Swiss-Prot record:
Reactions that this protein is recorded to catalyse: S-ubiquitinyl-[E2 ubiquitin-conjugating enzyme]-L-cysteine + [acceptor protein]-L-lysine = [E2 ubiquitin-conjugating enzyme]-L-cysteine + N(6)-ubiquitinyl-[acceptor protein]-L-lysine
A GO molecular-function descriptor: ubiquitin protein ligase activity
Taxonomic classification: Eukaryota, Metazoa, Chordata, Craniata, Vertebrata
Keyword Heme: no
Originating species: Danio rerio (Zebrafish)
Mapped zinc finger ranges (C2H2-type): 215-238
The encoding gene: znf598
Name of the protein: E3 ubiquitin-protein ligase ZNF598
Subcellular location: Cytoplasm, Cytosol
Length: 953
């Protein structure tokens, strides 16, 4: 019977002892309380149980020879108490775990409170008191190291001496593991021969079935007491996978190399950068965690971060229900797949039910095929109709008459594309069919009637709103050199300039004949050189024709755009059949036909509708063209956009284009002046030889009071000659709206005061537009040249760490003075908020840091997260350096203002280790410039609308 059960039996049977025994609950302990015995018939049985309980140890369940009693009054045998206090060095009660400072060994159990321990013998080292000398002798005997095999007892002072004696004298050995972990007396040790010791270590003892040997660590080839000790060793000295361990797997690895292979095979292991030398932290359970780590720690740019954030997820959709009479994209795919596999015929199934199923399936397939065929037919029909419309646009209109306002508005609303394209192909006057001989060959054109006639319907000013709206809105989409061609859009290659539109309208006495006589140039004052616009970008196409009103041939001839040599040959053929003009220049080139019309050089320099619409861009507002016209205008460019070459004569001729009647200006008595020779024209980016001077001295010039001398225009820059090769520039058509940097040097001197022609009032239809404000002075335009827009701040690499290093450097230079550092932070905050100007901030920081300010200024400027504030601080630094050089007596080569307006060269001139981004104007360190430049790769191909609006504003 177990000792606890025996104690409970004694509690029920013996009224002399009140025992509360609970071995597993320390709060309820067994206490021996002396009570007065009741003399009942069962006293003899209770006394027997009492003796049995008192003679058995509750720990080792052996008979108690000597009792060990503490203040908790839980008696145990003296052997168990000695093991705990001497061998294990533990002084608590094994029953209730109460700390026992003193223990008394007695032959009979007594209450500890009744004992007078001061009269007992004592072992002060272990705080054990003995009831008499025999008890003390018995305590010392169980602690002796005595040889069990010698006939004569041999006692050794230490166990090591006994072990050596047993090995040498008796060739017996004890188990080292048992000796280390088992706290037992020397006489309880087992001694083995070599063979028995090996069996004990591997399998256990034959007489002790509870011991199954000591487990072996296969990594270290060492054995441990039991599995618990082996597990401690594995987790302390070897490696295990913390992912698999959380799932309950017990797998261990000898070193980290094998564990990393397990991470690589079963999990996700990062081996980039610093992670190749780290342990545990660079392994991840799932792919999501792995990619999140790569995006956070190893992404060098946005593209890699975006790639790392992508997760491959497969979705499995349930099959959709069969739809009836509903056709979708998947149905077309199913039809195509079904047709590729071979469509079976009807009724081929072996049985009636199979035929029924096959017939139903084919019925659905036929419905889907029918829907697909109808859709394809509608698309082809639409395409044919668009081609027919294109062909109809090639046929000239027999008559041209002015329409009422209501009819024209209705037509433009109902057919915006067709009406605009048709009106764009009209010329001033009635043109016969032979004027359009399949874009080239034909008979001489019929006489052209004058367009300056009284209209049948009175026109209102509202019919001619300003053109600036469309001009401003048109460049919102950048023009690209390689644009997809639509079926319904007309390109320049389809409609080259027709020579019939350039034929003069009037004899030499008409006011509009100056366009044809002088090569489509206004006549200037005598001996004034004229530089004509010679650049036509490749994007100038027939979209001008399709988006503007009819052009009078006498006032504004069609420009010859730089497209191909084939088109030039066509023009030569068509011009050869024209009637000779009334007045020709006798000094024309020898290569030209004397009976031909205008030369290609003259045609190329004729202003276009875009020139005239640009004339109203400066301060006026323009009419909103239809959507088709606006889209086509985005692909056009004009060499004279925004240039001051537009005169009131141009405005008066524009009135002819808009079908607005205008009175003829009176002729003046000024002497005629020969025109200046033309500059080299550029077609398709190739400079041609200039034609000979077309000035004549035999015909009178009709210079009215509404005409002004034409000012020179800047020669085409290198960027404008090849607009498709320039990336960081405004779209074609808006480059020339702003004069170039050195445009002032090419301008001729203005006429003397008083000799400039007066400006007449604007023509009818343009009264709401202040024309005088449209002609800008080139000097003003040069000053107001737009600078690249300042972009948002893009954070460089290691931004946080560099900020911390910068703060630490500033603290070190300030000698860790918190007052000065707080003052520096206050200055920085005021500068960021705009309360402190950059110059004052620069001086304040220089006063705080002294000479050390130059050491931290470069990093302070680069890490300033505001591009505009960076430029201000950079300018302040440049001003200070320039002032410092002036004080030293050295004069700078350039003015301060220009030196700081040169972008990237400014930082190098100031000995700064930084560079300014030409795109967003952010100041960058040299090591960050290449990484920052890659962020703008896509910006050149797709500029933002805000950036373009800033350019044109």
């Amino acid at each position: 019977m177990h000792c606890a059960e025996r104690l409970r039996t004694e509690e029920r049977a013996s009224p002399g002892l009140i025992a509360c025994t609970a071995v597993h609950k320390p709060s309820k302990s067994t206490r021996i309380k002396p009570t007065k015995p009741h003399h009942t018939p069962s006293n003899s049985m209770e006394s027997a149980l009492k003796k049995d309980t008192e003679s058995t140890c509750v720990l080792c369940c052996q008979d108690i020879d000597l009792f060990a009693v503490g203040k908790c009054d839980h008696p145990v045998c003296y052997r168990c108490s000695t093991k705990m206090r001497v061998l294990c060095e533990q002084k608590y009660c094994a029953v209730c775990r109460e700390q026992l400072d003193k223990v008394v060994f007695l032959r009979k159990p007594e209450a500890f409170a009744t004992l007078n321990i001061h009269h007992y013998q004592c072992e002060k080292k272990y705080d054990i008191y003995f009831g008499d000398g025999k008890v003390h002798a018995q305590f010392r005997k169980i602690l002796l190291n005595e040889c069990p095999h010698c006939p004569e007892p041999k006692v050794f002072s230490k166990f090591e001496e006994l072990e050596q004696h047993m090995r040498k004298q008796h060739e017996l050995f004890c188990c080292k593991l048992c000796l280390k972990h088992l706290k037992i007396f020397s006489y309880e040790r087992k001694w083995y021969s070599r063979k028995d010791l090996a069996r004990h270590r591997m399998q256990g003892d034959p007489d002790d079935t509870s011991h199954r040997g000591h487990p072996l660590c296969k990594f270290c080839d060492d054995r441990y007491l039991d599995n618990d000790e082996l597990l401690k060793h594995l987790r302390r000295d070897h490696y295990f996978c913390h992912f698999c361990d959380a799932d309950g797997a017990q797998e261990y690895y000898s070193d980290y190399q094998y564990l990393s292979e397990h991470f690589r095979e079963s999990h996700y292991l990062c081996e980039e950068g610093r992670c190749s030398t780290e342990q545990f932290t660079h392994a991840f359970r799932t792919e999501i965690d792995y990619k999140a780590h790569k995006a956070a720690a190893h992404s060098k740019n946005r593209a890699e971060a975006r790639q790392n954030r992508q997760i491959d997820i497969q979705f499995n959709y349930a099959p959709r229900q069969q739809r009836r009479n509903d056709v979708g994209g998947d149905d077309y795919e199913e039809v195509d797949r079904f047709n590729r596999q071979g469509r079976p015929g009807r009724g081929r199934g072996p049985g009636g039910q199979q035929n029924l199923r096959s017939w139903r399936y084919n019925r659905e397939e036929e419905d889907r095929e029918m829907a697909a065929a109808m859709r394809a037919s509608m698309a082809s029909h639409q395409e044919e109709r668009s081609h027919a419309q294109e062909r109809s646009m090639l046929k000239p209109r027999r008559e041209e008459k002015l329409e009422p306002d209501e009819t024209r508005n209705n037509r433009s609303t109902a057919r915006p594309t067709n009406d605009t394209q048709a009106r764009s192909m009209k010329s001033n006057g009635s043109l016969a069919g032979q004027d359009f001989p399949v874009l080239g060959a034909g008979a001489p054109p019929a006489p052209v009637q004058s367009m300056i006639q009284k209209p049948s319907v009175s026109l209102k000013e509202d019919d001619f709103p300003s053109l600036s709206g469309s001009v401003v809105s048109s460049p919102m989409t950048p023009a690209y050199t390689n644009q997809p061609r639509k079926h319904s859009s007309f390109q320049e290659e389809d409609f080259p300039a027709l020579v019939s539109k350039i034929k003069p309208l009037k004899p030499q006495s008409s006011a509009a004949s100056a366009w044809s006589q002088a090569g489509s140039k206004p006549v200037v004052a005598p001996n004034k050189p004229v530089v004509l616009p010679t650049k036509m970008t490749p994007m100038s196409s027939s979209s001008i024709l399709s988006s503007t009103d009819p052009l009078p041939s006498a006032s504004v001839p069609q420009p010859l755009t730089a497209s191909s040599s084939r088109r030039k040959k066509m023009l030569t053929l068509t011009e050869s059949h024209k009637d000779p003009p009334k007045i020709r220049c006798p000094s024309s080139s020898d290569d030209e036909d004397p009976h031909s019309g205008k030369t290609a050089q003259e045609i190329r320099t004729v202003p276009t509708m875009l020139d005239i619409s640009t004339l109203l861009t400066v301060k006026g507002s323009s009419p909103q063209a239809n959507p088709k016209a606006s889209k086509k205008k985005k692909q056009t460019t004009a060499s004279s956009l925004g240039s001051p070459s537009h005169t009131p004569e141009t405005v008066s001729k524009m009135a002819h284009k808009e079908n607005v009647p205008e009175k003829k200006p009176p002729e003046t008595g000024l002497n005629k002046a020969p025109t200046a020779p033309k500059t080299n024209s550029i077609v398709n980016g190739v400079a041609e030889k200039p034609a000979e001077a077309l000035s004549c001295t035999s015909f009178p010039e009709n210079i009215t009071s509404s005409k002004q001398p034409v000012t020179d225009q800047a020669p085409p820059s290198k960027e404008e000659e090849f607009p498709a090769l320039i990336s960081k520039k405004p779209p074609p058509g808006f480059k020339s709206a702003f004069p170039l940097r050195n445009s002032q040097s090419a301008l001729p001197p203005p006429p003397p005061p008083g000799l400039g022609p007066a400006v007449s009032k604007p023509p009818p239809g343009f009264t709401g537009v202040p024309l005088n404000s449209n002609v800008e002075d080139s000097s003003v335009s040069a000053v107001n040249r737009p600078t690249p827009a300042i972009g948002s701040y893009l954070i460089p690499d290691h931004f946080q760490q560099r900020n911390m290093d910068l703060i630490q450097s500033i603290k070190n230079f300030l000698q860790n003075d918190e007052t000065k550092f707080n003052e520096f932070k206050n200055y920085s905050g005021q500068f960021r908020q705009g309360a402190l100007p950059a110059v004052q901030y620069y001086k304040s920081c220089q006063e705080l840091l002294g000479e050390n300010f130059n050491r931290v200024f470069n990093e302070l400027l680069v890490l300033l997260p505001d591009t505009r504030k960076q430029q201000e601080l950079l300018t302040a630094h440049g001003d200070f350096k320039a002032l410092e050089k002036q004080q030293q007596g050295s004069k700078p080569k350039k003015s301060k203002k220009k030196a700081w307006q040169t972008g990237t060269s400014s930082s190098s001139s100031l000995d700064l280790d930084c560079q300014v981004c030409p795109t967003c104007k952010q100041v960058l360190a040299l090591k960050d410039f290449n990484t920052h430049k890659t962020l703008h790769i896509g910006d050149d191909d797709f500029p933002s609308l805000q950036a373009i609006s800033k350019i044109i504003s």
